[in-house]
């Protein structure tokens, strides 16, 4: 006797029909996650192209920022809203723009549109990895790994400005604009000396080193199992045997370092752990800066350097440079504040 478990076609509702259609096997998988990913990614990318092509930053930053004004790919940007907008979501129909699309673009509405849809698109991409992994019986480590970039994006573009006075202090979406934000972070937060930044650098550069070492080691130990000039055509995706010698790789690195991974599972988990942990540490550090937490202020060196003109360290020299960044950037970056600094307050010292 055969027992059928499930519901008959007559009991299937619209949700079941939609679920089947979304999860149908097609060239590009759609899925429930696609309902979030595809429209949000399309709108975020479209808004960025629109802003960098046509929209000025004159009303928000006093800058030219579009191809229409003469910028190139490196200098164009979708700039953050005006400082006076605070943390407003800036809906087109909101009290700021009042349904005027041109005014909405002028006050920085495209930035909030791009940032929020971009964040939702990234989250949708992670959910897509979860969904496909679940359907084909994989573990969800790809989605877990992608949580690192999401954490960095959300912390830098959303959480940091939420802790500050407004969206104005977030990075604008552009290459040179990101560079300016890095200088801002250093000058106002001494970011390079922050331990969370150090862990982030160690994670990202360490991951690059691990990736290079791993790729080179596998290439070095490929089995010569083909007749061609190289071993690439000899590989078959369905072959049962190994394509490189783990034993040889282990012996090589044991001679180099004295220790080596003998377990492929630990090796690849370590390659996952290093960059993802580094990105998460960076994200945590940025959230801390959002609420103006300080890290590594060596006050004793500052006091001694102030009292003894012959005593200076790389730390005190960097502090002078940070003071210069703050003094000169504030005038340029916030022209609406009409800052005026007299010559006496500008930083002086051997560092300059």
Swiss-Prot record:
Organism, as annotated: Cyanophora paradoxa
Positions annotated to bind chlorophyll a ChlzD2: 117
Family designation: Belongs to the reaction center PufL/M/PsbA/D family.
Subunit structure: PSII is composed of 1 copy each of membrane proteins PsbA, PsbB, PsbC, PsbD, PsbE, PsbF, PsbH, PsbI, PsbJ, PsbK, PsbL, PsbM, PsbT, PsbX, PsbY, PsbZ, Psb30/Ycf12, at least 3 peripheral proteins of the oxygen-evolving complex and a large number of cofactors. It forms dimeric complexes.
Catalytic activity: 2 a plastoquinone + 4 hnu + 2 H2O = 2 a plastoquinol + O2
Classification via SUPFAM superfamilies: Bacterial photosystem II reaction centre, L and M subunits
Enzyme class label: oxidoreductase
InterPro entries recorded: D1/D2, Photo_II_D1/D2_sf, Photo_RC_L/M, Photo_RC_L/M_CS, PSII_PsbD/D2
Cysteine disulfide links: none
Note: 2 of the reaction center chlorophylls (ChlD1 and ChlD2) are entirely coordinated by water.
Binding-site residues, Fe cation: 214, 268
Binding-site residues, a plastoquinone: 214, 261
Enzyme Commission designation: 1.10.3.9
The name this protein goes by in its record: Photosystem II D2 protein
Source taxon at top rank: Eukaryota
GO cellular component, one term: chloroplast thylakoid membrane
PROSITE patterns: REACTION_CENTER
NCBIfam families membership: psbD
